[in-house]
């Protein structure tokens, strides 16, 4: 049986961090962490599979430096060290990607497994692996042997969350690393969650009012034509399993398995730097908590050295520095998948779907679920010409509508090779050549060498015959089908721009009306706007770049003040405030006065920042809750979830859309307008603040509302009330619009949900150009000294220098080392 805590865990199920300790779902009891489960930091140990001795040193962060005489031995050791630090994460991500969580979690995980079997990441991974070069396959094989050397040596000393779950880990296969890459790619699928949410919202408000709730930048037309695709469809009753699918997708997105992953990266050209040499900055943002999926690694082998960000299970450095080139990645928010509504007819065990006026038999295959505590379950997965019919419930598709997911195929994709080649690129020019071969994942790649900077969009983007892909399209009509993919030479790029800097922060990076469609689900523009402000403010260096990464000033506050002062708003808003009951009127006036004086700095100790964020929360409820509520409804949850992944209706309405039907409060007989709702929101912000922070408004602090909760996604830790897995919550500043990002759920709670998990800066003017930090710890094992040891340095902005020159290794990593020798 699954543990009783599982039902509370599932709403946060699915991310790499969550999967890290999924194995403790068995409900075991855990004592203190066993140091025998931790890789030693020193000594000499034989290891079968090595050709020559390998040295592993660690810095104070726990980051390993692997020194070897051959690249083969370096990869083998990387597999061994990755497993030693993050074996729970690796196993959990693999089972999640395979759709096999119910083997350890029981029946409560079946819905997640059904969805993941439908998505079929194993097929994508197989295509990627088969398309890889023999060289790359050898690398993955050697890495897998290193993982398996750990699994064999520590078979009786695995971390407690793994060992006591009643699960015997299978050995790692080379293809499993391609599966981890496919899972990473799936985690960037912003639009899948949004398309499901759009159907839920359409059920509530109808197709006519749906366009106002879709992610649309202020300078773009609302997508009424896109919403018209749903007109005439009985969405409430005909779409099989929609509520289940949306609920599971929300659970997956809650911890970064669908669309939440964000990031910022930028490069400063020599003419903008104090030294006359380039700088590159990167931070990768994931849901807050223990532990981040990202960790650092450094490898030195003959003809190969690299330091940077890695994900355990994948023998690639995805963002890093090789001594000549620095590269980083951020989420494009690309839309390279589509949902299709399919008309389904069932006759006995035979399922057909409508395609251009004809009923066509659906392809099918069997899936077997080995459920812990139960009998095996065999179910059929059906596929149309667009892809598999998504399913999260035991109910097979019947007559009506079902949803098929179409994704690009990767049969000839060389992305895995390209990432390895990128880590060896000597300059920006070569980085462009290799990154254009990265087609399996949509990224903003930013590069820098000492003299040049560059930006390249990667991925495979479909050419849609009609429609934008914002909403599910009628699958029975071929006019919405894909017509190949955009040529990678058409992908946006830039090199050494006149302005002297390049930046990507999930914003729309292309002008309106660009010749190819990347997305309609862009992130908020404010982080990119703030980068532009600071990059243009003067010459940059390491110190100013650190300050940029920790900057907590939002440009959204200034935009809000502009709206309040606009000629058509200033007087009506004052009149609306004056018309409020006395208590509300006084509160609204106070809020208005303070917000107009607010400097936009969202520090944890700021009273005005607390008021500002209270206003944002209350305005969302005042605008939308009457139509989409209650707050527990699927429609409201869909609105809140979408605001965490893309530019939201909440922001869009505050800054514009004065003619939106949502300004009217449908629960009152009169018709409200925008000034009336803004006045109510101002008053409600103070009222809500009084209830949460007390009546002394000057004593309010944003950090008393907004907290970093350093809790493990490990369900066992939750059963035990925290214990060794968790760390104390701490006050946080910033929000989803600040460079030091700290997003919360807009329309729900104030707890920090997203935070920078790994930061990297490369300043080419320095003797040792690279510095970095992670926000939690290098290890996922609480028995390790490197579990959660980076929280305090992360809070204080204490970066670590990461030396690439051998003469500086001792200063960065010390003298202590673990020596691994060839075993017999």
UniProtKB/Swiss-Prot annotation:
Gene Ontology BP, a term: antibiotic biosynthetic process
Location in the cell: Periplasm
Molecular-function GO terms, alphabetical: hydrolase activity, acting on carbon-nitrogen (but not peptide) bonds, in linear amides
Gene Ontology CC entries for this record: periplasmic space
Catalysis performed (reactions): an N-acyl-L-homoserine lactone + H2O = L-homoserine lactone + a carboxylate
Pfam family, one: Penicil_amidase
Signal peptide positions on this chain: 1-26
InterPro entries per the UniProt record, alphabetical: Ntn_hydrolases_N, Pen/GL7ACA/AHL_acylase, Penicillin_amidase_A-knob, Penicillin_amidase_dom1, Penicillin_amidase_N_B-knob, S45
Domain of life according to the entry: Bacteria
Catalytic site: 264
UniProt-listed CDD domains: Ntn_PGA_like (cd03747)
Phosphoprotein in keyword set: no
Alphabetized UniProt keyword annotations: Hydrolase, Periplasm, Quorum sensing, Signal, Zymogen
Enzyme nomenclature, EC number: 3.5.1.97
Subunit-structure text: Heterodimer of an alpha subunit and a beta subunit processed from the same precursor.
Misc remark: AHL-mediated signaling mediates quorum sensing in many species of Proteobacteria, regulating hundreds of genes, including many that code for extracellular virulence factors.
Cited function: Catalyzes the deacylation of acyl-homoserine lactone (AHL or acyl-HSL), releasing homoserine lactone (HSL) and the corresponding fatty acid. Possesses a specificity for the degradation of long-chain acyl-HSLs (side chains of seven or more carbons in length).
Family statement drawn from the similarity comment of this UniProt entry: Belongs to the peptidase S45 family.
Protein name: Acyl-homoserine lactone acylase QuiP
């Amino acid at each position: 049986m699954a543990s009783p805590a599982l039902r509370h865990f599932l709403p946060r199920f699915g991310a790499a961090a969550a999967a890290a300790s999924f194995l403790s779902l068995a409900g075991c009891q855990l004592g203190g962490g066993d140091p025998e489960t931790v890789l030693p930091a020193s000594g000499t140990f034989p290891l079968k599979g090595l050709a020559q001795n390998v040295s592993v040193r660690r810095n104070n962060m726990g980051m390993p430096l692997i020194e070897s005489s051959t690249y083969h031995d370096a990869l083998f050791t990387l597999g061994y060290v990755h497993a030693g630090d993050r074996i729970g994460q690796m196993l959990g991500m693999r089972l999640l990607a395979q759709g096999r969580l119910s083997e350890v979690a029981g029946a409560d995980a079946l819905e997640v497994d059904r969805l993941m079997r439908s998505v079929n990441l194993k097929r994508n991974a197989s295509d990627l692996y088969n398309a890889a070069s023999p060289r790359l396959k050898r690398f993955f094989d050697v890495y897998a042997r290193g993982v398996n050397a750990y699994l064999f040596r520590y078979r009786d000393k695995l971390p407690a969350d793994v060992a006591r779950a009643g699960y015997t880990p299978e050995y790692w296969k080379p293809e499993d690393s391609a599966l981890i890459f496919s899972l990473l790619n799936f985690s960037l699928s912003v639009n899948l969650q949004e398309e499901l949410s759009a159907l839920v919202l359409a059920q509530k408000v109808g197709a006519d009012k749906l366009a106002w709730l879709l992610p649309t930048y202020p300078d773009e037309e609302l997508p009424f034509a896109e919403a018209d695709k749903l007109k005439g469809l009985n969405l409430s009753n005909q779409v099989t399993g929609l509520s289940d699918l949306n609920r599971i997708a929300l659970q997956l997105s809650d911890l970064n398995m669908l669309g939440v992953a964000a990031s910022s990266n930028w490069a400063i050209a020599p003419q903008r730097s104090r030294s006359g040499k380039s700088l590159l900055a990167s931070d990768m943002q994931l849901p807050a908590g223990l532990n981040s999926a990202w960790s650092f690694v450094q490898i030195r082998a003959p003809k190969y050295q690299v330091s940077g960000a890695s994900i355990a299970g994948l023998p690639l450095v995805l963002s890093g520095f090789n001594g000549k080139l620095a590269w980083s990645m951020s989420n494009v928010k690309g839309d390279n998948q589509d949902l299709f509504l399919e008309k389904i007819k069932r006759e006995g065990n035979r399922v057909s779907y409508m395609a251009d006026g004809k009923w066509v038999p659906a392809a099918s295959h069997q899936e077997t679920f080995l459920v812990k505590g139960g009998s095996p379950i065999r179910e059929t997965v059906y596929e149309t010409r667009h892809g598999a019919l998504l399913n999260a419930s035991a109910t097979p598709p019947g007559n009506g509508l079902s949803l098929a997911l179409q994704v690009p195929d990767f049969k000839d994709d060389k992305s895995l090779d390209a990432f390895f080649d990128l880590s060896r690129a000597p300059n920006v020019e070569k980085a462009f050549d290799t990154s254009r071969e990265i087609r399996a994942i949509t990224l903003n790649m930013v590069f820098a060498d000492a003299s040049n900077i560059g930006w390249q969009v990667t991925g495979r983007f479909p050419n849609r015959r009609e429609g934008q892909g914002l909403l599910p399209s009628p699958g029975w009509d071929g006019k919405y089908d894909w017509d190949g993919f955009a040529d990678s030479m058409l992908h946006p790029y830039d090199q050494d721009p006149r302005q002297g800097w390049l930046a990507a922060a999930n914003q729309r990076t292309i002008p309106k009306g660009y010749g190819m469609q990347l997305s309609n689900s862009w992130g908020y523009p404010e982080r990119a706007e703030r980068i532009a402000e600071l990059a243009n403010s003067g010459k940059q260096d390491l110190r100013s770049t650190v300050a940029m990464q920790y900057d907590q000033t939002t440009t959204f506050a200034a935009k809000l003040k502009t709206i309040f002062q606009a000629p058509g708003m200033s007087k009506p808003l004052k009149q609306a405030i004056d018309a409020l009951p006395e208590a509300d009127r006084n509160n609204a006036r106070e809020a208005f006065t303070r917000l107009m004086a607010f400097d936009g700095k969202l520090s944890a100790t700021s009273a005005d920042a607390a008021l500002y964020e209270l206003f944002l929360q209350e305005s969302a409820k005042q605008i939308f809750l009457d139509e989409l509520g209650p707050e527990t409804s699927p429609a409201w949850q869909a609105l809140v979830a979408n605001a965490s992944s893309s530019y939201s209706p909440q922001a869009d309405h505050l800054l514009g859309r004065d003619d939106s039907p949502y300004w009217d409060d449908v629960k009152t007989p009169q018709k409200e307008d925008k000034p009336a709702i803004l006045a109510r929101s101002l008053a409600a912000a103070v009222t809500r603040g009084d209830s949460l922070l007390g009546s002394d408004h000057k004593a309010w602090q944003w950090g008393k509302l907004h907290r970093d909760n350093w809790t493990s996604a490990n369900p066992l830790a939750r059963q035990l009330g925290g214990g060794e897995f968790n760390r104390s919550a701490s006050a946080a500043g910033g929000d989803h619009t600040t460079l030091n990002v700290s997003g919360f759920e807009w329309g729900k709670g104030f707890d920090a949900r997203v935070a920078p998990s790994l930061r990297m800066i490369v300043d080419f003017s320095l003797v040792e150009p690279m510095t970095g930090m992670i926000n939690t710890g290098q290890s996922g094992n609480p028995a390790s000294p490197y579990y959660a040891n980076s929280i305090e340095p992360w809070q204080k902005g204490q970066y670590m220098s990461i030396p690439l020159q051998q003469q500086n290794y001792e200063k960065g990593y010390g003298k202590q080392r673990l020596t691994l020798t060839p075993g017999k």
